[in-house]
Design a protein with these regions (language model features):
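A short, structured beta-strand-centered segment in the mid-to-C-terminal lobe
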Residues: 83-103
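Charged, glycine/proline-rich intrinsically disordered loops and linkers
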Residues: 71-89
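Amphipathic, well-ordered alpha-helical segments in soluble domains
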Residues: 16-23, 52, 103-106, 110, ...
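Helix-turn-helix
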Residues: 33, 39-42
């Protein structure tokens, strides 16, 4: 991954899992029912990240079998998310959180051996290592959601590396001129409030504590 060492990406991944679990520890019994991400409650959010971690295992299984095609299109993400939440509707927030941590850490343990394997995800075909940055970003963004539900902010320890690594994945997933231009702009973005840029790109509004 140009410019972002593997160890940095994995550290950000581990940090995202840890910080999400730590944020959940701050929730009261009633807090699990409060809105945390759009129409999703904190419980819904825990179920969502559990489902996403499961997808990552499934996609890596496909990659190991030699299938690097996208599992479904990006336009299907909303429907896939809704279906996954329905499937986990009987699982409480704390239980979903505990299962997420175990599943996410197990995925991380698989990554090192498969870092350069071609890997399909909804936005295209990259490598498992490039996609690891997207996974790290997913955990940090949803940590931000939980922390804001608690009235606090969240920022990853190395926002510039997270921005660069996720940008490298997005650029690799694009084809032709668009991908090349995106790759050229990454170094500039790392110096211009990278975490705020990630938040805004995901539809979130940075606060004073971010």
């Amino acid at each position: 991954m140009p410019g972002v060492p593997r160890d940095s990406v994995l550290r950000l991944y581990d940090e995202g899992v840890h910080d999400f679990a730590a944020a959940a520890d701050g929730l009261s019994a009633e807090g699990w029912d409060q809105l945390a991400c759009g129409e999703w409650t904190a419980t819904d959010l825990a179920r969502h990240v559990l489902a996403v971690a499961g997808w990552y295992h499934d996609w890596l299984d496909r990659a190991e079998r030699g299938d690097a095609s996208p599992p479904f299109g990006a336009q299907e993400l909303a429907a896939q998310n809704a279906e996954a939440l329905r499937a986990l509707s009987g699982l409480g927030g704390p239980e979903a959180m505990a299962q997420f941590v175990a599943r996410a850490r197990a995925y991380r343990d698989r990554l090192s051996a498969q870092w350069d394997v071609p890997y399909g995800y909804p936005r295209g075909t990259v490598t498992a290592g490039l996609h690891a940055a997207v996974a790290a970003c997913e955990w940090h963004l949803h940590t931000w959601d939980l922390m804001h539900a608690l009235g606090r902010g969240h920022r990853p320890s190395d926002a510039a590396s997270l921005y660069a690594a996720t940008g490298a994945c997005s650029a690799a997933a694009e084809s032709g001129l668009k991908g090349r231009v995106a790759a050229m702009l990454i170094p500039l973005g790392t110096h211009l409030r990278p975490w705020e840029a990630i938040l805004r790109r995901s539809g979130r509004a940075p606060g004073p504590d971010d």
